[in-house]
């Protein structure tokens, strides 16, 4: 039957050379300039041709990359390309925030982000906020005033221990981002190394909690080009590695505590390329520190190098830079394509911002 037939139909067509393609394209342009009409000149400083041939791939080492294998160009997971759907909650009242969290969890969200007030932090506050939320079933992310991140970490660990959770299984993050504060405010505050050390010590029992943040979303929302966001983010992450390894902390431990928050612009194909390049470049940056593998792991590199430490943890959020005020429902289309590019690129979690974020407090419809 035809269904069982495995004929190679391409053999019925004679091969077409690049020169023949160009002749056909030039003829169809009817005298228009090929470079001006069809070649895309990106803001990143390189040109994208309208078609590519096998010869364009010659010499590229990345074409043999596989998912889940160093340097993780095609993702850090071998078997799937799943991502977590995250929603942000600004906590004004812990009881109300808890009710909202439970509601959106029932609607399919599997990652929560709480922005909590530092002045109100105590054990009762955490218990009220997380009541009936299974910390082993959902990723929990927290941010607060940078001077109170260690206190927040200690309260969370105490709460998880009180609830008798297996802390080695819990996934989440605490947003300590020393360099973002400098970027936003133009001045240093506190001792990064001392705070980071205290934070790593406080979360030692939470190996899957990332607590050193690279918030490149700030750059994206300020209108940076993709290459700028990528370059600064990698330098930012490397600065954590450099200072903390110099302070005596193991490279593998530091790398496994860093999380990257990127924005997603509407530049569809280059956003896919950005996330893929970010993973590959970060893997090589971490590898340059020769992180030592401290357990029996099949993902070891040469000389007992910890390849797991080189996996970049990425959260992505649709950009607010290009949201429009005057026809806000257009933002639904923009955020949809932005989210799709991040999903195809293999991010770990994603926030799609409400379409009316620029002018109104989000309601149930816009959050959905």
Predicted features along the sequence, with ranges:
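Catalytic alpha/beta active-site cores
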Residues: 3-267, 271, 292, 297-300, ...
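ATP-dependent phospho-/nucleotidyl transfer catalytic cores
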Residues: 280-285
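Short glycine/threonine-rich loop-to-helix capping motif typified by GTGT followed
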Residues: 224-230, 265-277, 319-332, 360-368
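Flexible glycine/proline-rich, aromatic-decorated loop/lid segments
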Residues: 305-317, 326-353, 363-368
């Amino acid at each position: 039957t035809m269904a069982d037939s495995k004929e190679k139909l391409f053999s019925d067509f004679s091969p077409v050379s690049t020169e023949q393609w160009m002749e056909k394209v030039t003829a169809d342009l009817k005298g228009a300039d090929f470079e001006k009409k069809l070649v895309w000149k990106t803001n990143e400083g390189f040109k994208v041709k309208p078609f590519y041939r096998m010869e364009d791939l010659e010499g590229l080492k990345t074409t043999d990359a596989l998912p889940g294998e160093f340097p993780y160009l095609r993702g850090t997971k071998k078997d799937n390309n799943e991502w977590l759907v995250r929603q942000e909650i600004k906590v004004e009242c812990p009881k109300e925030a808890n009710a909202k969290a439970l509601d959106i969890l029932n609607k399919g969200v599997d990652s929560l982000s709480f922005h909590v007030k530092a002045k109100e932090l105590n054990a009762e506050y955490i218990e009220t906020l997380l009541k009936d939320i299974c910390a082993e079933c959902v990723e929990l992310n927290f941010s607060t005033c940078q001077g109170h991140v260690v206190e927040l970490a200690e309260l969370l660990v105490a709460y998880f221990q009180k609830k008798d959770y297996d802390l080695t299984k819990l996934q989440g993050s605490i947003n300590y981002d020393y360099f973002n504060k400098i970027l936003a405010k133009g001045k240093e505050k506190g001792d990064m190394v001392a705070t980071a050390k205290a934070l790593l010590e406080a979360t030692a029992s939470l190996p899957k909690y990332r607590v050193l943040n690279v918030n490149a979303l700030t750059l994206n929302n300020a209108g940076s080009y993709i290459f700028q966001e990528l370059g600064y983010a990698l330098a930012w992450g490397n600065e954590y590695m450099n200072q903390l390894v110099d302070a005596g902390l193991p490279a593998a431990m530091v790398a496994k505590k860093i999380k990257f928050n990127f924005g997603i612009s509407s530049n569809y194909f280059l956003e896919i390329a950005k996330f893929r390049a970010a993973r590959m470049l970060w893997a090589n940056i971490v590898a340059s520190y020769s992180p030592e593998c401290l357990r029996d792991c099949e993902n070891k590199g040469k000389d007992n190098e910890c390849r797991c430490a080189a996996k970049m943890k990425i959260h992505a959020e649709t950009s607010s830079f290009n949201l429009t005020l005057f026809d806000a429902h257009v933002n639904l289309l923009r955020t949809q394509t932005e989210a799709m590019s991040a999903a195809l690129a293999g991010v770990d979690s994603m926030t799609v911002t409400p379409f009316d974020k620029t002018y109104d407090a989000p309601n149930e419809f816009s959050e959905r």
